[in-house]
Amino acid sequence: MKEINIAKMIAKKRKEKKITQDELAKYLGVSKAAISKWETGQSYPDITFLPILASYFNVSIDELIGYEPQMMKEEIKSLYQRLCHDFTTRPFNDVIEECQDIIRKYYSCFPLLFQMGVLIINHSMLDSNQTQKLNEQAKSLFERVKLNSKDVDLAKQAQMVEAYCCLLLNEPQEALVLLEGSQKPQLSGEVLQATAYQMLGQLDEAKAALQISLFKSLISIVEAFPMLLSLGGVDQFEEIVSRFMKVEEAFELRKLNPYVVMPILLVVAQGYVQLGKVEKALDYLDDYSKLCTYDFYPLKFRGTPFFDVIEDWYETFDLGNIVPRDEVLIKKSMKDALLQNPVFTVLHENERFTHLVNRLGE
């Protein structure tokens, strides 16, 4: 039972008091073997001993028990979905206050803390007066998960998102420290897994492992394009755009994960505006608006005939196959990306621009 940590607390408090198991046993009138079993979790003290132990160690009974409530994966998923929706229907401060209560209650449930951090950074922009403070809190949550979780994969994820929080907080040097070593070559675990499955004759499992490996690598490649476009210079801009569009078409990215394609179309449009090629920019914004209104609602990640195991893979995530924000907020952000982007201000009087903005409002 993960919620009860009395074994650990008795051992800890006894050592802090600098007494032996024998001395504690004599004080309570029990055997040394009983104390040993309590401290190793083989048995629990009788309920009548709890107030005596708490008084002896000068702690509350709750602290002695070490009660650390946990939440199951499906409960975390359901809670996250509800809170996402609440941000669109309830006052922002009310939802944030509920989040704080949940964090306090489940401060040792690290999978939940991780998702609460994700929830916060995906909604902190809804109140600009609190954005900085909330992003700082999210960063501290990811740091706590990184330092305390026994789940190695979760701790690694927490460190990555902690680095992302550093960027949100304009702390690039700290982000680099957290990301140190991330560029070192790493052997793909999925490829090794696929090889093992193949040797066992489990070909479907081998195929699934390879698909997941390829998909993860593909997403990493695509996520690099926006910054490449901004850093590549005028002479490389159209070459980078051309290469991205070939990758996007080859793997049907807009069907697979439209959310990674949308921001790149916006960056391409921005680049063409800055190059003075307004019609080219509008072509990509038109593509963006059509993609935003494509029939992929309800929002979730989907597979394709080539990537036919991806949907099932997403279902293994803690949040399952859902996006991190509510559909209402996502639709609003799609429109805001055009109207609130200063680069596109010069297009506001353009008839084509007005038409595609209206399309997003439909």
Region locations from a protein language model:
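Alpha-helical segment of the N-proximal tetratricopeptide repeat
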Residues: E74-S108, Q115, N122-N129
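Short coil/turn connectors between adjacent alpha-helices in alpha-solenoid helical repeat scaffolds
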Residues: L83-R90, I121-E136, C166-E174, L228-E239, ...
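DNA major-groove recognition helix of helix-turn-helix/homeodomain DNA-binding modules
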Residues: T48-E63
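Alpha-helical protein-protein interaction modules
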Residues: I221-N350, T354-H355, R359-E362
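Short alpha-helical DNA-recognition segment
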Residues: K18-K37
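A short, Lys/Arg-rich alpha-helix, primarily the initiator
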Residues: M1-E16
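Generic helix N-cap/helix-start motif at coil->alpha-helix transitions
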Residues: K73-Y80, Y106-L113, S149-Q159, S182-L192, ...
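Solenoid-like repeat scaffolds
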Residues: P69-Q70, Q100-S108, E143-D151, V177-L187, ...
